[in-house]
Amino acid sequence: MPASGAGYAGGSIVPDGRTLVNCRDLHKARDAYQLRDIEATRAAHSLDLYRELTGDHKENHTNTSSDYVKAVVFGGLDGIVTIFAIVAGCVGADLSCSQVLMVGLGNLLADAISMGFGEYVSAAAEKDFVEAEKQREEWEVENCPEEEKREMVEIYTEKYGFSRADAQSMVDITFKYKKFFVQHMMVEELGLMYGFDEPTPIKRGLVMFTAFCFFGLLPLAGFIGWVAAFGLGAEADMAFLMACVVSIMTLFILGFSKGKFVGQNPTKSACLMAMNGGCAGTVAYGVGSLLQLVVGANLTAA
């Protein structure tokens, strides 16, 4: 910790030791920005004021939860679009409900494992790389302090338009707090974030796997119910209609959530995601139907 007692955990330092990310409500700040509501923005930047105005006395923990929300939303979108397209292609090829289920469930499990493992590998590699760069920067700050300070002076003057005197003063002050200086340098020089309370690679992989499985299972739910009611040889048309309704509705909800999460227009994001799923399903159905016609014609000719 810095000698002054001011804390740093990935946000901007404030006088009482909290970080900026902990003394404001980021979700409320984003909502206020969407509405261009100045008073709501001011309230969101003061957690105490926000609680006084709303009566909400719960602690605000945004860093880790945001990572989980991201994994759930994007993993869910991948899962439902992928499996819905597979289901549509199978129905277009005139497969029975049981055949659609076999193909769909097999792909669901395989794709979920692939997505979860890919997220784990990607997160682990990113974490290792950032840690290695942090250790290098710490070594350089310890052994080549003047060179590191000069780099930051150049960044302030060239990137942000500081005068050389102000840049030098800024560097001299921040260099007293080595942990802050290293983290700040990693952001400005390397574009790397370090010091946030992020989920472990294993947790990120498991969340991605679970989200893909859960949302990917929704297009198959109608087929599971249809087979349970009418047997393995049941026609797939009505089950596919149910899958279409469930999938498009879920895509709309996930798209809306994605828009809220990334600060886009939620309704526009919802419509785009629903359109994406609809287009993927339509193309897959068309290809399946075409292949069924070609294969059927060849079998008849034979």
UniProtKB/Swiss-Prot annotation:
Annotated catalysed reactions: Fe(2+)(in) = Fe(2+)(out)
GO function term, MF aspect, one: manganese ion transmembrane transporter activity
KO phenotype (gene knockout): Mild growth defects in cultured parasites under normal conditions and more prominent defects in replication in an iron-depleted environment. Lower number of parasites per parasitophorous vacuole. Accumulation of less iron and/or altered distribution of iron within parasite cells. Parasites are more susceptible to iron and cadmium overload. Parasites have lower cellular iron levels and increased catalase activity. Iron overload leads to reactive oxygen species (ROS) accumulation. Decreased survival of parasites within macrophages and decreased virulence in a mouse model.
Expression induction or repression: Down-regulated upon treatment with excess iron or iron depletion (at protein level). Transcript levels are down-regulated by excess iron and do not change in case of iron removal.
Record's bilayer topology term: Multi-pass membrane protein
Subcellular location: Vacuole membrane
TM spans (from-to): 71-91, 100-120, 212-232, 236-256, 277-297
Vacuolar-facing ranges: 92-99, 233-235, 298-302
A Pfam family it matches: VIT1
GO cellular component, one term: vacuolar membrane
Highest taxon in the source lineage: Eukaryota
UniProt topological domain (Cytoplasmic) ranges: 1-70, 121-211, 257-276
An annotated GO BP: iron ion transport
Residues at which Fe cation 3 binds: 140, 148, 151
Broad class of where this protein is predominantly found: membrane
Residues that coordinate or bind Fe cation 1: 137, 140, 148, 151, 189
Entry function: Vacuolar iron transporter involved in the transfer of iron ions from the cytosol to the vacuole for intracellular iron storage. Plays an essential role in detoxification of excess iron. Important for parasite survival within macrophages and parasite virulence in vivo.
Family recorded in the similarity comment: Belongs to the CCC1 family.
Name recorded for this polypeptide: Vacuolar iron transporter
Protein source organism: Toxoplasma gondii (strain ATCC 50861 / VEG)
